[in-house]
């Protein structure tokens, strides 16, 4: 039968939506939460997620923002429409992007659909390399397949590492080559301090980005592919 999934990635959207009243404030809130709760050194990221996801849904007073370690943490809040910086700390400091890597993985997938290279119904095969990725994952097995729409939902809802690799291999042949493609796309978007080497964000010392670069990517995801933006509000999906 089909299995229902509800995952940790959806809290970014839910938390943003709770304090938003209009398009401008909504996207600003979404960017604020993405860039202040998720772009930390790897050891702090998961703990910060657990802490923030259970806080009361009250408006944030940015004047009182206190980060755990100002020397390590990075934060950037921008107006999602104008790009104006509202709050910044270590915005250009290099950090490991962790699962925010998947923002670029999906950007590449959305771009392939816009170009007509794939559709939501395109079926992508699962390799052994994809199947052996560490959790979180959809626990796909080598030889299985997944269509593009389920892959998008698995990445957004579950932050599925195996599915991110399936996308990478389908679009780039190998995950290594896809990392090069992602880095090239980052340069085209103006993300000059970002280097990708995998599609999932699993630990790799060479994979780095900045809060500033990820803000650029977040805006491009919204404005380059508005037809797919609704996927970011997905709170669950069923996969067989």
Provide a role label for each language-model segment:
Residues 40-41, 112, 147, 240:
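Proteins with a high burden of low-complexity, intrinsically disordered sequence enriched in S/T/G/P/A and R
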Residues 7, 28, 42, 89, ...:
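Intrinsically disordered, low-complexity regions enriched in small/polar residues
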Residues 213-240:
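Extracytoplasmic
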Residues 47-212, 219-225:
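Active-site-adjacent loops and short helices of periplasmic peptidoglycan-processing enzymes
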Residues 1-74:
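N-terminal secretory targeting signals
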Residues 1-5, 160, 236-240:
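Short intrinsically disordered, low-complexity coil segments enriched in acidic
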């Amino acid at each position: 039968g089909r299995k229902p999934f509800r995952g940790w990635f959806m809290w970014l959207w839910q938390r943003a939506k709770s304090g938003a009243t209009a398009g401008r404030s909504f996207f600003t809130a979404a960017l604020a939460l993405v860039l202040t709760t998720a772009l930390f050194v790897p050891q702090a990221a998961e703990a910060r997620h657990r802490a923030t996801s259970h806080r009361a849904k009250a408006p944030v007073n940015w004047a009182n923002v206190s980060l755990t370690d100002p020397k390590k943490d990075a934060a950037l809040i921008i107006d999602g429409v104008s790009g104006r910086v509202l709050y910044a700390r270590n915005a250009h400091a290099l950090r490991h992007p962790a699962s925010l890597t998947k923002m670029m993985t999906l950007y590449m997938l959305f771009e392939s659909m816009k170009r007509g290279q794939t559709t939501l119904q395109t079926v992508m095969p699962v390799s052994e390399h994809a199947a052996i990725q560490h959790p979180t994952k959809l626990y796909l097995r080598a030889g299985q397949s997944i269509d593009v729409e389920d892959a998008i939902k698995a990445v957004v809802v579950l932050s599925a590492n195996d599915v991110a690799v399936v996308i990478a291999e389908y679009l780039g042949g190998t995950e290594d080559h896809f990392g090069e493609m992602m880095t090239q796309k980052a340069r085209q978007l103006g993300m000059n301090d970002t280097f990708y080497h995998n599609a999932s964000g699993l630990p790799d010392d060479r994979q780095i980005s900045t809060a500033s670069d990820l803000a650029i990517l977040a805006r491009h995801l919204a404005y380059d592919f508005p037809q797919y933006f609704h996927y970011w509000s997905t709170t669950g999906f069923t996969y067989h």
